[in-house]
Amino acid sequence: MNESKSVASNELTSGKVERTTLKLSDKLKISSNIQQGNKFSLNKSITTVEVRKSKKRKNIDEAARSSLLLQNNDIDGNSEDKNSLTIQEQISRMNALQNASNNEKREELSSDSNKHIEEEVISVKAEVEQPVDVVLPNDNLLIESDSSEKVIVDPVTDSEHADKDVQDVVMLDEFVSSNLDDAGDQKNGDQSDDISDLLEHKGIEGKKLKKYEKEHEEKKGNPKKVMSNNTYTKHVKLVIEEELEEDNNKQVIKNYRSKKNRVTNRSVKNKITRKVLIPNKITVQELANSMSERVKDVQQVLYQITGKHDIKLTDYLDSDQASIIVEAFNHTFKLVDNAKLENDLYSDGNNMELIPRAPVVTVMGHVDHGKTSLLDAIRESNVVDGEFKGITQHIGAYQITLNGDKKITFIDTPGHEAFAAMRAHGTNVTDIVVLVVAADDGIMPQTIESINHVKAANVAMIVAVNKIDKHDADLDRITNALLQHGVVAESLGGDVIVVPVSAKEKINLDQLKSSILLIADLLELKAVYNTRASGTVIESKVDKNCGVVATLIVQKGTLKVGDIIVAGNQAYGRVRNMFNADGGSEKVAIPSMPVKVFGLNNVPNFGTSFIVVDSEKQARELINYRQDLLNVELSKQPAIDKSNVLLYDMVDELNVILKCDVMGSIEAICYSIGKITHKDIRVNILYKGVGNITKSDVLLAETSNSIILAFNVKTDTQVKELAKQKNIEIKHYFVIYDIIDDIKKILTGMLKPLKQEVQIGTLSVRKVFSVGNNGSVLGCYVTSGLVKKGALVKLVRNNNIIHEGKIKVLRRFKDDVKEVTAGFECGILLDYSKEIYPESDVMNIFEIVEEIRVIQ
């Protein structure tokens, strides 16, 4: 094995370096006194160096004695190597001690100038404060230097590798120590030369140290720092610290990236990745709920994308923005077209088998012509007795069975003018219209309207001339009147069946039923049964015991208990129960069958369509899509003319809270109220809803100064007491006529009287007695009409009105009078202080007349 020298530098108080020569083949013994200190391990090699710092340097003698410990340690090897120091090296040591003494004196002279350098040394001290601790697998060798720094080395099994590791560590120790000494003793050229010569003499090892020194200086980029030997302990700087610093930098970068990921991507270990369905438009709140993320986090990411600060939960996002946000949270997404969803729902069953179904017959006609009575006679029921004053206020749907297996579905519509929308919706779901005309009244306005609805819907029609049992009934007169409106009876060569009937006497009811079945057979009515159910909402209301109740007619498919339905753009829910018109429970409903369903979350508008969907989530998506379409349509409406806003605000308002039993009644009343128009007053329906009067309705009426209109609903005792305390008026009605009439009366009372100026006389000025600040005293003659005290006077000069005022005082001679008629003279006090010309000035007398206005 080649031998090379390894140098262990022991720092003396003078700053000199003492060298001890060891052979690489020598084996180091282990010191039994091992003190544990602060340490950190570095797996640079299997050899580890533990450096312990001393508190304070001893004197030069103690340093010399400490340096001899290395020489006196037992070394396994040849006995001839025990005295390892040569004579030349001993002389060098003595010279080093002498130089150290000289350097100490020079250091004392320059200590004041080096105070600022000592401050830099503190930072260097902090960097090398931590000792390096390397543990060898076997025994330990304690090497003590004069700086009281202890290096504990453990030999390894392979002595060759162990020798090389010890050599590298000791050489590295010398390199760092020499660097620090050079910084402190720049002027000591002899010592610097000795160290340089020694490093160059080491050959390959010296080159390595130069390379380390160069890399160390390039990385640090700092000037060499001078350390005062009298004040601070010199520490061994290892190149290992550079790698530790790089590791620290890598850890800082890793921490920064981890924090950045938490802020931007919110990536969390074991986070659930969700698949988010993104429609064309979605709100911030809905998107956050779909991802199960906090809304605040979604808003933060959205701010990074758009740069907007004022992001609300209800703001809509398009599909592109939503997809970017979903990816930012490491979720996946799928674009969903809700328009396609709705089309797919309604396209189900188009190519399936068609099965015959029952006809849907709508009974229409003018009010009080006997529509409900006719249905009662056909159904053998007594619905009309349950209606207030015998007037139908709602749409009713019934199904009867004829001849054992033939079924007919009847829809009864109100005949009042206000229910025009109901009749229009009734024709949209019907197959056949039975137009009821009273034989004694003939064709009436709602009869004509019903005929127009039939023509618009292009459905078959049968005319039932009711009350044929009356003595003044004239069938020919009815058929001729129908001819004027384009309805040609079979007796006149047309295709419209006219059946004279009597609901009261039950005349020709079988003929009417047969006519309905005949037309139904001709129409060949069929529908698909084996598909998702869809149809129309006939009526809806809120029941205090059952909640929302909706009357539906199934037009396609089969509706079952447990199905989830969507009705219009605001109501959906699971069908909990179904009942027929007679109150019987039903499990399924086939096409043309009317049923009452329970379970919707909201009251749907009558006339809207319903359809069965797969899940509540799909139901919500469909509702949102329809509401978006509605918002788009509303946004297309023309904006309010700003020039009319001021005039609109000046119009008086009657605030109304409307509560009805069913949605159809609400629409009918709103339709009728909307027809009441006046330029100076209007009705503002502040709130409308289905159900009984509640405390919240009373409180709303109090804050908005409204009246409450209750149609076919009740008010409990507590609500009545609250309304009495708040002085809120609640008006109850059971007939729509009464509501409209009362609203007109209330509006009439709110209208201000119309004031008009009516000329009642003319005065000519005869003499001007005085003109002053208090007015003018004039002598006048009544040329026409009369003049009254306090009347309005318009002073006219050359056909121009130069003054308008009132007569403050009216006298005849010395007496105050109330009026003076034509042909008499009078004196007046006029509130006018300018010059008056008796010859040319004329005064016209006017009286303010108030005209009471009435809303028709």
Curated annotation (Swiss-Prot):
The keyword Lyase does not apply. It holds the Pfam family IF-2. GO terms for cellular component: cytoplasm. SUPFAM superfamilies: Initiation factor IF2/eIF5b, domain 3, P-loop containing nucleoside triphosphate hydrolases, Translation proteins. The keyword Cell division does not apply. Residues 502-504 are annotated as: G5. Keywords: Cytoplasm, GTP-binding, Initiation factor, Nucleotide-binding, Protein biosynthesis. Residues 390-394 are annotated as: G2. GTP binds at residues 365-372, 412-416, 466-469. Residues 365-372 are annotated as: G1. Residues 356-526 form the tr-type G domain. InterPro entries: EF-G-like_DII, IF2_II, IF2_N, P-loop_NTPase, Small_GTP-bd, T_Tr_GTP-bd_dom, TF_IF2_bacterial-like, TIF_IF2. One of its GO terms (molecular function) is translation initiation factor activity. PANTHER family: TR-TYPE G DOMAIN-CONTAINING PROTEIN (PTHR43381:SF5), TRANSLATION INITIATION FACTOR IF-2-RELATED (PTHR43381). Belongs to the TRAFAC class translation factor GTPase superfamily. Classic translation factor GTPase family. IF-2 subfamily. One of the essential components for the initiation of protein synthesis. Protects formylmethionyl-tRNA from spontaneous hydrolysis and promotes its binding to the 30S ribosomal subunits. Also involved in the hydrolysis of GTP during the formation of the 70S ribosomal complex. This is Translation initiation factor IF-2. It comes from Ehrlichia ruminantium (strain Gardel).
